[in-house]
Regions:
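Glycan-recognition and catalytic cores of secretory/periplasmic carbohydrate-active enzymes
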Residues: 1-178
């Protein structure tokens, strides 16, 4: 994002070209468009897909909104459509599955308030802006209300159980996992 802000501040064509290339790479190469990880992104090490980390935050629409709104690129619109409901991938790919016992959970998955839920919000906000579909606005509001119920609200800690179908969050304490 910092490259886009640098371009907006400077108007420098070189910075635009660099930010555009990074956005295109990240949206096309680092995001799964088919298969069991569709809607997720993969960090990469020395070679692409070298990391077992498959997460929504790597694919989130927020990384590419500047390019979309500056150019109207239809391909990015297609990618945003792929991502707008990617919370459902959390049913199969719980980002905190290695840290919590499934049998003790109330909701079927987890979402950290920072890297997971905020990434989903980025997708929902983009879907709401582009299509004025109130469902995406409601998903954001549901999560905000749930976070407000945590003892210290947003600063309570990052770990929440998450229901991808209702988009509700359930605070589970300050375990600092993930």
């Amino acid at each position: 994002l910092w490259l886009w802000y640098a371009f907006l501040r400077s108007g420098n064509a070189y910075v635009f070209d660099l930010a555009e290339r990074l956005s295109r790479h990240a949206s096309e190469v680092d995001v799964y468009h088919i298969g069991k990880f569709k809607g997720m992104g993969s960090r990469h090490n020395v070679s692409h897909w070298g990391c077992p980390c498959k997460e929504a935050r790597i694919a989130m629409a927020g990384h590419h909104r500047f390019l979309y709104y500056l150019t109207g690129d239809r391909r990015l619109g297609d990618i945003f459509d792929e991502l707008k409901d990617n919370e459902l991938t959390f049913l199969e790919h719980d980002p905190l599955a290695d840290f919590y016992a499934k049998e003790e959970m109330v909701y079927p998955s987890h979402a950290r308030s920072g890297p997971d839920w905020s990434s989903l919000c980025s997708n929902w906000m983009t879907a709401w802006e582009r299509g004025n579909d109130e469902r995406y606005h409601q998903k954001i509001l549901i999560g905000l209300e749930d976070i407000k119920q945590a003892p210290l609200q947003l600063v309570s800690g990052p770990d929440f159980e998450f229901d991808p179908e209702s988009c509700h969050l359930r605070y589970i304490g300050e375990c600092a996992a993930g």
